């Protein structure tokens, strides 16, 4: 892996990352395909058409449904889903702690019940790395605990210490797996995760600890889980400066276009969030003038595209009125078109961000973008 910062504009940075599955230009928004597909009937051909650089899939869900061992028999997730660009897999940790019925956290890992059939499953650092190795993703995430944002300082500190020990085990297991002859991707990369709730001291200490581990990248987890936007931005302000400047920084699970604009200004490279697809399936679409709800009656006779000048498949061919009709009729095409538009909007915004940073005009771009999106609601 080679990561090179091309341009800095204040704390915002535009970088180029070379991986075994292709080049990633940052800042980048990863399109979330939990089980190897974007919800809303979006194919990998669609993703290529709308400019997606990185797809993100979920280790936990792929493990409990189809099974990572089966996917390995197909040559890994890339071949299984016919995607030739980078894939990031999360560790499964967040789902273990938030979706499944937690039985017990031990030093070895976590035992829990599957949310599908109730069977007992054990997952620890080694198991998470083994599953992600079977999937053969470009980037694997370390197994961590995401403590509740309002947990006590002592609980957060104990959790972070355990996450650090788990990270060391993840690194050792990945090194072992990448040396095996039958490993799907022997150049799989490992990102560690910074935790610490909204406690400055713990965040900083943990960032300083994991930056010494010489990982391929560093994520900031445990945000967008109930804290205010101001708290999120503050944690980025105090944490990012303590992570290596020559490695990518990933803000997990974030977020809205406004969140992304603010986080880029604080040195973040990678983003992911389900908002574009989830909102699209419910008729909410993003524009440069704010978010629209196409279910609203005001669009019943609206012959305009979702956004004038947008190059997405929905805006090239269909009116707001027609898409509203599809949504009201519960036709899958309506959800698909809204999802494609939203993902295209995000991908295009990231391209504009990269260009603005490279031309050292990010402050002006951000101000202009925010002025449009934070104006009066458009319905």
Task: Name these PLM-found stretches.
Residues 31, 61-63, 94-95, 147-148, ...:
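Short, solvent-exposed loop/turn segments at secondary-structure junctions
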Residues 1-184, 297-300:
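Non-catalytic, usually N-terminal nucleic-acid engagement modules in DNA/RNA processing proteins
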Residues 22, 55, 90, 132, ...:
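Conserved, mostly hydrophobic/aromatic
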Residues 22, 163-170, 210, 239, ...:
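Hydrophobic alpha-helical packing residues
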Residues 127, 131, 158-169, 205, ...:
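A non-catalytic, amphipathic alpha-helix used as a structural packing/dimerization or gating element
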Residues 164, 173, 177-179, 185, ...:
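Glycine-rich phosphate/ribose-binding loops and adjacent secondary-structure elements
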Residues 1-18, 24-33, 40-41, 144-150, ...:
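C-terminal extensions of enzymes
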Residues 148-152, 157, 217-223, 332-335:
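Glycine- and acidic
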């Amino acid at each position: 892996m080679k990561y090179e910062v091309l341009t800095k504009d204040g704390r915002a940075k535009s970088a180029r990352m070379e991986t075994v599955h292709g080049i990633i230009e940052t800042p980048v928004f990863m399109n979330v395909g939990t089980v190897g597909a974007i919800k809303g009937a979006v194919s990998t051909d669609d993703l290529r058409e709308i400019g997606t650089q990185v797809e993100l899939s979920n280790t936990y869900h792929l493990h409990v449904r189809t099974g990572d061992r089966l996917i390995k028999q197909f040559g890994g997730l890339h071949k299984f889903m016919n995607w030739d660009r980078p894939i990031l897999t999360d560790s499964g940790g967040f789902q273990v702690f938030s979706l499944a019925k937690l039985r017990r956290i031990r030093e070895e890992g976590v035992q829990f019940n599957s949310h599908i059939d109730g069977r007992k499953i054990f997952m620890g650092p080694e198991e998470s790395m083994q599953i992600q190795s079977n999937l053969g993703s470009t980037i694997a995430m370390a197994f961590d605990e995401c403590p509740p944002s309002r947990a006590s300082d002592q609980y957060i500190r104990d959790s972070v210490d355990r996450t650090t020990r788990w990270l060391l085990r993840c690194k050792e297991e990945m090194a072992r797996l990448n040396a095996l002859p039958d490993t799907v991707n022997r150049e799989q990369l490992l990102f560690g995760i910074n935790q610490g709730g909204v406690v400055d001291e713990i965040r900083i200490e943990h960032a300083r600890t994991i930056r010494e581990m010489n990982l391929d990248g560093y994520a900031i987890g445990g945000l967008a889980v109930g804290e205010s936007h101001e708290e999120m931005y503050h944690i980025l302000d105090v944490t990012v400066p303590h992570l290596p400047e020559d490695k990518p920084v990933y803000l997990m699970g974030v977020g809205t276009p406004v969140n992304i604009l603010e986080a880029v200004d604080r040195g973040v490279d990678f983003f992911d969030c389900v908002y574009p697809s989830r909102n699209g399936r419910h008729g909410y679409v993003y524009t440069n003038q704010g978010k629209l709800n196409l279910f609203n009656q005001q669009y019943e006779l609206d012959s305009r595209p979702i956004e004038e000048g947008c190059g997405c498949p929905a805006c090239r061919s269909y009116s707001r009125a027609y898409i509203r009709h599809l949504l009201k009729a519960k036709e899958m095409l309506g959800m698909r078109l809204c999802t494609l538009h939203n993902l295209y909007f995000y991908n295009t915004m990231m391209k504009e961000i990269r260009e603005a940073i490279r031309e050292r005009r990010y402050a002006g771009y951000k101000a202009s973008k925010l002025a449009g999106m934070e104006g009066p609601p458009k319905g």
